[in-house]
Design a protein with these regions (language model features):
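C-terminal ends and interior cores of transmembrane alpha-helices
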Residues: 80-96, 298-314
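Short amphipathic helix-loop junctions that connect adjacent transmembrane helices
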Residues: 29-42, 239-260
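Juxtamembrane intracellular "pre-TM" segments in multi-pass secondary transporters
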Residues: 1-6, 190-224, 417-422
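Helix-to-loop junctions at the C-terminal end of transmembrane segments
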Residues: 59-70, 276-288
């Protein structure tokens, strides 16, 4: 466990990386593809928004469902649902050109990946020493980033010029199916899962506690706000940036090709892979909240505005865009301790706290595109980017009200040993 993760869980990281490669295949081009089929930018953004809403609900349910029925079982259910619904989306809904069908099937597919990845977070929380959990979460998010961002972004940049955008959507299936099979064959079962002694009423109460804890625990509520904010651009930029950078819609400049944007986005995720591991260890050593407050929030402010203004002032400058991707990637990955913060704020209800974390994470997939859907037609891409940046600045202030029980630190984020020496 030198890397902070038991060997028995390594297969789970591989499964997540492979599965999320399939899930991330579409992120850098689907919004543009939908617009190219004759739909508006708002209709395209709405599809991602509804997808995010379903993902938020699935994320909320995943933590408690994994505790009740076993993390591996819920992972398999989520992956299977994703594969079936993706087949319906690509094979039936998209070719039909019927927008309500496209919207409905794509939104329903949002149930799949949260059940798959966040159930594994429960398995990690059940297995790993809390003092090492942030480091382990660093590896978890590294695997996630490698899949959804690196392979998921870079591979389409090569397949789209060869087979086009529609057939590139089909190429995501082998990866997601492979991730499902790795989970089936190699991921261990939860030791304390599937508690058959719980009544149906108890199960419903435990599930509802994942949301109720947001009302009754102020610390969890504040952490949820930061959790939503920290990934706004992660899910908002794939919706607006292909339109801003590669088309002339709503004031876009068409500076880059979609394949170039895919490479910029993929490079950002290369940075987050290393950032997730680095920040996971830094958070365990120097304090979770301080890191997110000063590096996470403010790097994201700079990186978010840079994505908009660099093309405005310097045109199609790949070097500067990649440099900005480094800043944004380091900012996003600095929030990696969030997975450890939530259970540390509710030690007596870890399952509900993890569900609240997953719910907030899912809400980011909802609010990121929602901001774009509501604002892009009125204040343009620049206004959307400024909205994201202001949210990050607000998030920095909110962190002052969050005081998790981090091992080795007091409630204000100071090392206990340092205080004792004074």
């Amino acid at each position: 466990m030198k890397i902070g993760l038991p060997r028995t869980l390594l297969a789970g990281l591989v499964a997540i990386a492979v599965f999320m490669t399939g899930d991330g295949f579409e992120l850098t081009f689907l919004s543009k593809y939908i617009v190219d089929q004759g739909f508006s930018s708002s209709q395209s953004s709405l599809m991602f928004t509804m997808y995010g809403l379903v993902a938020a609900l699935a994320g909320w349910a995943s933590g408690v469902l994994a505790e009740m029925f076993g993390a591996k079982r819920i992972m398999l259910i989520g992956a299977s649902a994703w594969v079936v619904l993706h087949l319906l989306f690509v094979g039936v809904a998209l070719p039909s050109g019927v927008y309500p069908l496209m919207l409905g099937v794509y939104a329903l597919r949002g149930v799949g990946y949260p059940l798959f990845i966040y159930s594994f977070v429960v398995l990690m929380a059940q297995t790993i020493d809390p003092a090492k959990l942030a480091s382990a979460m660093g590896w978890f998010w590294a695997a996630y980033s490698f899949g959804i961002g690196v392979f998921g972004a870079y591979l389409p940049s090569f397949t789209i010029p060869m087979v086009g955008e529609y057939y590139s959507l089909w190429l995501s299936l082998p990866f997601s199916i492979a991730g499902l099979l790795i989970c089936l064959l190699m991921v261990p079962k939860s030791k304390g899962s599937g508690n058959s002694s719980m009544s149906n009423a108890d199960k419903l109460r435990e599930l509802s506690r994942g949301v109720a804890i947001l009302v009754h625990n102020r610390q969890i509520a504040l952490a949820a706000v930061v959790r939503v904010i920290c990934n706004l651009t992660l899910y908002g930029f794939p919706v607006i940036m292909p339109l801003y950078l590669a088309t002339t819609n709503n004031g876009g400049g068409a500076w880059f090709k979609v394949s170039q944007w895919s490479q910029i986005w993929g490079f950002q995720f290369v940075v987050t892979i290393f950032g997730n591991v680095f920040w996971g260890r830094m958070g365990d050593s120097h304090g979770w909240m301080r890191q997110m407050r000063w590096f996470g929030c403010w790097f994201c402010v700079i990186g978010t505005l840079g994505m908009y203004y660099i093309p405005q002032f310097f045109g199609a400058n790949m070097v500067l865009m990649c440099a900005d991707a480094v800043v944004l990637g380091l900012g996003i990955s600095a929030f990696v301790p969030m997975g450890a913060v939530f259970p540390a704020l509710a030690l007596e209800h870890k399952g509900a706290a993890i569900s609240a974390h997953n719910f907030a994470s899912g809400l980011a997939t909802f609010f990121g595109p929602l901001i774009a859907t509501v604002l892009v037609s009125t204040i343009g891409f620049g206004g959307v980017c400024w909205t994201y940046a202001i949210c990050y600045a607000i998030g920095s202030l909110v962190t002052f009200g969050i005081h998790p029980h981090q091992p080795g630190f007091d409630d204000r984020g100071h090392r206990i040993a340092a205080i004792e020496r004074n």
